[in-house]
């Protein structure tokens, strides 16, 4: 078996429409496949990765001790990483910086409380 990349991440959201608006306006995702599946799920794209937004709660999936940890997005460059921090501050979104030695990351939450990371290996 040969796999290439993650195709999409599916999220359960209290309000998929509000979550979509946040990902589009805050992180630059694009709303795609708008005329498919009666709008469920809402599909967003960033580069070659998709998010599928389903109605429901954070606990909608059944789990045996596992669960969603976070979604990491890679900045194109260190200046883009710095720009992301400025953009989040401008929008009043708090974040936490971490130096992982091989990368730098910032962590913050989306409107449904899911943890997001923006990272760069361009040190």
Feature locations, PLM:
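Short, charged/polar surface micro-motifs in flexible loops or helix N-caps
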Residues: 47-51, 58, 78-81
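Core segments of cupin and vicinal oxygen chelate
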Residues: 12-51
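Short glycine-enriched loop/turn motifs at secondary-structure junctions
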Residues: 3-5, 64-68, 99-100
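Short beta-strand micro-motifs in enzyme catalytic cores
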Residues: 40-42, 69, 104-106
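Acetyl-CoA-dependent GNAT
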Residues: 54-58, 120-123
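N-terminal beta-strand motif that seeds the catalytic metal site of vicinal oxygen chelate
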Residues: 1-18, 71-73
